[in-house]
Structure formats: structure tokens, C-alpha cells
UniProtKB/Swiss-Prot annotation:
The gene is ybdK. This is Putative glutamate--cysteine ligase 2. Keywords: ATP-binding, Ligase, Nucleotide-binding. The keyword Nucleotide-binding applies. It comes from Escherichia fergusonii (strain ATCC 35469 / DSM 13698 / CCUG 18766 / IAM 14443 / JCM 21226 / LMG 7866 / NBRC 102419 / NCTC 12128 / CDC 0568-73). Belongs to the glutamate--cysteine ligase type 2 family. YbdK subfamily. Its EC number is 6.3.2.2. GO terms for biological process: modified amino acid biosynthetic process.
Amino acid sequence: MPMPDFQVSEPFTLGIELEMQVVNPPGYDLSQDSSTLIDAVKNQITAGEVKHDITESMLELATDVCRDINQAAGQFSAMQKVVLQAAADHHLEICGGGTHPFQKWQRQEVCDNERYQRTLENFGYLIQQATVFGQHVHVGCASGDDAIYLLHGLSRFVPHFIALSAASPYMQGTDTRFASSRPNIFSAFPDNGPMPWVSNWQQFETLFRCLSYTKMIDSIKDLHWDIRPSPHFGTVEVRVMDTPLTLSHAVNMAGLIQATAHWLLTERPFKHQEKDYLLYKFNRFQACRYGLEGVITDPHTGDRRPLTEDTLRLLEKIAPSADKIGASSAIEALHRQVVSGLNEAQLMRDFVADGGSLIGLVKKHCEIWAGE
């Protein structure tokens, strides 16, 4: 399938997707009932969309194109109310978090969807193992070349995005010792990690054409890069975050990415080069393993910096951009989070260390999502 032309969109507009967990009380294992919920709510959603993801235990909430995080928050809040009522009607519950702490991948049912069934045929059990839950953020771009510049700029801050959203310390009933274990699930996919280097949109079109020769790629949606351009929407899509436990944190993460994009495309602070990616996977690993306590290394100078310190520096740099696009509240909230040292992964571990069970942990996450 040929790649569509890049559809120009209004710069810095926003779209957010949240992959939510559908769980079955009182055992709080993953349910296989997302289709039931989608059928129940499809005529009640007036803005945004509630839809399938890979398996029947995943429920995706997606906003329409939004001008700012306040509009996105309003759409999510309305969807959340409808979904929670439908879940209660069917004796189900909903929660965030990047992984379910004790589900077994062998039990997961792939959705009856042509694309997902084709993906199952290509990737086998890897697709069932990909029953993990992330937040994706789209940012509008005026051109394909702007999208490539923005993608490279945002890639510098992938460790920061992972660390701030880390919410997946448990998997398959085990403490993984990672703050964010979710990204590890995709390491076996041939397109895992950063997009191969291109310097402009024309080179990207050549790259996509080459990838299509493998017969495994029908569209951009079949590529699992950490950040990818989406020509159909005219956006760049950041895909590295765990789904947060609260709607407010999800909105704050979107505000961070929107403000960072505004700063990058307005100030053009970097002259991107392929060497920028030399230590990409090492820095990404530090964020996944240690969260904000990780240490990142500059591929050009060899300087090593604590992620906490570098994240505070980023928040300071983008504050003027955040003010211009209505995202200051997000930057202020994330600044408080970094200074306090609190993060969702550690809060989960604290709950278990205090005697809580993994079943109790999922129940608590459902209460948090419903109570906000």
C-alpha cells in the first residue's frame, strides 16, 4: 500500500490516546470484554472515540483533534463517565498502569479485527504478549519536513517521557525491578526503538517504500517505533509512555509533549544528525530501569547527567512555550512531581511493601481511576 501524502494540520494541535485495562472483580484479572463495553457506549460518545486495541482486555480512549490540553481533558472526562457507567452495568472495572501486574499473556484473546488478525499471523505470540497499556500523543505539524525535525527533537527526550510516566514495575506476578517494564515487551519486534535515520520527508518516503518490500508493512500503523510520523493525520506520534493511573497525569504528559514540540519547532535549538542516536537505547534503558533516578549520557561529549536534573532543565526551557499554548498547569504539576521524587511505579511498590497484594493493587488502581 503506498504511503499517503502528508496531510497538513494546524501546528501544535493535539490528539491523545489512552490504552486502558478492562478488569474483572473480585479477582481483578484482565477481562476479555472490551467489545461488550464498546457496544454499550458507542452511541453515547459525543466527542472522541472508544475503540478496540490489540486484545479484548484493552480499551482505547482517544480524543478528537484538540487545540489544547483543557479541551482534551474535557473530552476524556466525558468519555470516562460513560465508560465507567457501562463497566459498572456489566460488572467490570477500568484502570490505568502500563502493565497488568499478574495477567498471563496466554489467556489474551486478539480482537476480531482484520488488521490485528493479520498482525497475529505475522508475529504470533508476540502480539498476545503485547497486552500492555500505553499513552500516545499526536502533535500537529505544518509539513512533512517539520514532522521529521520534530521527531528527531522529541527523540532526545524519550528517556524523560518514559521516566515521568513510569507505571509498570510488575509483570506476570513479579517485580521486574524496572520502573517501566512495558517497553521491553516490544524488544523482539523488528521495528522496535527509534525510527531509522532520515533527514527529510523525501527520505522518509523512500524508507517507507523500502520497508513495504518486506510485505509486513501495509501502513504506518504497522510500525512500532517509539516516535513515528502519521501522514494521514499530519502529526508526529509519541508512543513511549505508560498509561498513567489518573486522567490528570495523562493530560499533564500530553501538555509536556505539546510544549516541547512548540519549543522545538519555534526555536529550532538543534541541528540533528545521525550520531544523536548513538546512545539512544542506553539512555532509554536507564529511564525504563531506574525512572528519574537514571543517568543519561550525551553521545557527543560523553557527559553524564541525572535524569532528574535534566528533566528539571527541560521543564524550565519549555515553560515559555507552555504559557503560549495553555499548558503551564501541566509543566507546573510535573515540576512538583520531579521535585517531590514521587512516581507511580514507586507508589505501587510501596503499596505491596506495606502488605498489599497484587489483586489489591489492581483494585486500588480501579478506585483511583474512578475516583478522580
